[in-house]
Amino acid sequence: MGRSSIPLKKSEYTTTIMAQDALALMDHLGWIKAHVVGHSMGAMISCKLAAMVPERISSLALLNATGGGFECFPKIDRQMISILIRFIRAKTPEQRAAVDLDTHYSKEYLDEYVGSDTRRKILYNEYVKAISSSGMQSNNGFEGQINACWTHSLSPKELEAIRSTGFPISVIHGRYDIIARLCHARKVAEKLQPAARMVELKGAHLVSHERPEEVNQALSGLIRASEAKISLQDWSNLHGDGVDRQVAGLSVSLKRCGEGYFTCIIAILAKCFLYLIGILMMVLGHLIRILRRFKPARVGSAES
């Protein structure tokens, strides 16, 4: 994924292996306990680390997290299909930078002016420079990263190890994240009850960049709660909210369907169609990358 050596087998990329790497680093540094913060796939790795050695975790912060597997699929709509097509076609740092900006930040944030330039222009130049200096991500690295997210899950035993040890947890998420969907982050928080607090902020996938002050406040509050040994019941803000939210959502859906049954069915079918198109685009992109590995054989000119 970075500049280090890259395993050729995607099976060598798992959140468990990466959590073991993090634990080895803690041992090397002599850290008995730590406040652990993870973002996106790093949040998955942090959960695995917390499940491995819960007694060594002081607090756990999960930014823009999902539960892995099918929850890694983004919301498929016209915007996401456009992004997928642009991602597959991106061959230069400039093209990749433009795609990354739309997946990392909200449009509102990118359109804000900082001096005479928009954030989009400023960040675009920074992204192009960074990608140009480090190079485009290798296919093996990308496929390994996808494999790590796709195969990630937490067993009931692992979930119990995390939530029963006594350290507080914050699940921090951007409401406009199109990569890691907010509904899946809420599920993560609900599974980690009674230890988790849900923090929803105005931002996208890189909510820590869009809302640094709010994220820092949330992290500081988490650390203070850990040091003060606050009870988990006092820490969590999800007492019954998860179930109530699901029931409310179901009621709204049924009400809408009752008001216009065929309209509801058409809307569901449209979403399914867009979802299938998105999956097909991802498969097509994967096949294109595989075919590019095979170089055509050169045939010499026939002698007359």
Where are these regions (language model features)?
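Active-site loop/oxyanion-hole signature of alpha/beta-hydrolase fold enzymes
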Residues: 1-37
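Short beta-strand immediately N-terminal to the catalytic nucleophile in serine-hydrolase-like folds
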Residues: 36-38, 63, 172
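Gly/Ala-rich beta-loop-alpha elbow adjacent to hydrolase catalytic centers
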Residues: 38-42, 46
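Flexible "cap/lid" loop of the alpha/beta hydrolase fold
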Residues: 51-52, 58-92
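Conserved alpha/beta-hydrolase catalytic His-Asp/Glu region
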Residues: 94-146, 150-153, 158-161
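Short beta-strand/loop motif that positions the catalytic acidic residue
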Residues: 165, 171-173, 177
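Conserved alpha/beta-hydrolase "acid-adjacent" motif
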Residues: 178-184
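Catalytic active-site module of serine/aspartate enzymes centered on a nucleophile-bearing elbow/loop
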Residues: 194-304
